[in-house]
């Protein structure tokens, strides 16, 4: 080290040295010592002087005081101190650990930006651990909706659920878990009949089942509709339409003629009489039409009334040709 540098180091302790005669290394060392002497220790921190400005790029002092008064003070949720920029949060102390699952920093800002368009009623909580237990039962925040009183909110809740009946035993204010109302399951007999009806329906047989009414319970069951008549959907259905025929038999057949279980014969003589009567009776004379029932559902240009009118006109025309032109048909 040169004599100039030695004299410069001696001048540091005595007073403000003259940096013109120093070397570059000595000037750097001198500046570091001055910065360490200016920096306050953590135990006894002195307030900043009035003339000091630009701590970490922010003005501190008279200018900053004017800005805080103009801008409305420290931003909410941010505790500031000297040497830290305005609006920056202080990290937690060394002794305390942050709880697991707490979203902080840029991730919290990102979730808040994603939930910007969601209603606060439907928005899930970002940090469940940060929510105080006492504030969960509050319906609304007083700062966001000060115009809704607690009595009005209770009235709104009552209007929102008018169908709920209060239980006399439990009381008005007691809470109970949500109970889903389900229909009671049908009895085994009904299920068996339904399976049998489906089995017979697939084979083209008519089935008409009456579902028995279940016993009255506390919950009123839904109305059960009886099963419809099920007919075969084959395309070979024949529809017989009877047109006015004075010679046809108008009296209906007795029930014993179409019953599946006729009464047992008592003697041989009445049986012969019944056989002779059955031979004498003739079936009603009608006009059998080969008619497909499935055509009704298909879009056709001709309706049933037009079809039957054409058949009637043909019958009248044949009658006129046989008897002469004595009748005039009026459509």
Swiss-Prot record:
Keywords: mRNA transport, Nucleus, RNA-binding, Transport. Pfam families: FYTT. Residues 30-51, 63-99, 158-193 are annotated as: Disordered. Its main location: nucleus. The keyword Nucleotide-binding does not apply. One of its GO terms (molecular function) is mRNA binding. One of its GO terms (cellular component) is nucleoplasm. It comes from the Eukaryota. The keyword Transport applies. Residues 166-175 have a biased composition (Polar residues). InterPro entries: FYTTD1. It is found in: Nucleus, Nucleoplasm; Nucleus speckle. A motif (UAP56-binding motif) lies at residues 16-34. One of its GO terms (biological process) is mRNA export from nucleus. Transmembrane segments: none annotated. PANTHER family: 40-2-3 PROTEIN-RELATED, UAP56-INTERACTING FACTOR. Required for mRNA export from the nucleus to the cytoplasm. Acts as an adapter that uses the ddx39b/uap56-nfx1 pathway to ensure efficient mRNA export and delivering to the nuclear pore. Belongs to the UIF family. This is UAP56-interacting factor. It comes from Salmo salar (Atlantic salmon).
């Amino acid at each position: 080290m040169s004599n100039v540098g030695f004299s410069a180091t001696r001048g540091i302790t005595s007073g403000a040295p003259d940096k013109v005669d120093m070397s570059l290394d000595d000037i750097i060392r001198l500046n570091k010592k001055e910065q360490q002497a200016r920096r306050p220790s953590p135990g006894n921190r002195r307030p900043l002087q009035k003339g000091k400005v630009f701590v970490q790029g922010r003005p501190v002092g008279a200018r900053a005081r004017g800005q805080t008064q103009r801008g409305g003070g420290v931003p909410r949720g941010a505790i500031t101190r000297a040497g830290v920029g305005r609006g920056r949060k202080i990290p937690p102390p060394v002794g305390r650990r942050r709880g697991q699952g707490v979203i902080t920093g840029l991730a919290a800002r990102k979730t808040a930006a994603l939930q910007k368009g969601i209603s606060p009623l439907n928005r899930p909580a970002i940090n469940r651990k940060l929510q105080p237990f006492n504030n969960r039962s509050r319906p609304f925040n007083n700062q966001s909706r000060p115009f809704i009183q607690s009595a009005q909110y209770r009235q709104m809740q009552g209007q929102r659920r008018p169908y709920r009946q209060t239980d006399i035993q439990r009381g008005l204010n007691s809470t109970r878990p949500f109970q889903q109302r389900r229909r009671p399951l049908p009895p085994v007999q009904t299920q068996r009949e339904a399976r049998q009806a489906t089995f017979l329906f697939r084979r083209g047989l008519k089935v008409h089942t009456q579902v028995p009414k279940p016993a009255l319970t506390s919950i009123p069951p839904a109305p059960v509709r009886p099963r419809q008549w099920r007919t075969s959907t084959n395309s070979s259905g024949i529809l017989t339409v009877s047109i006015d025929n004075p010679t046809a038999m108008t009296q209906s057949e007795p029930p014993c003629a179409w019953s599946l279980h006729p009464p047992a014969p008592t003697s041989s003589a009445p049986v012969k009489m019944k056989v002779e009567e059955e031979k004498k009776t003739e079936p009603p004379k009608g006009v059998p039409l080969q008619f497909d029932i499935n055509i009704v559902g298909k879009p056709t240009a001709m309706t049933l009334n037009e079809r039957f009118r054409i058949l009637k006109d043909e019958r009248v025309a044949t009658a006129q040709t046989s008897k002469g032109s004595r009748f005039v048909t009026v459509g």
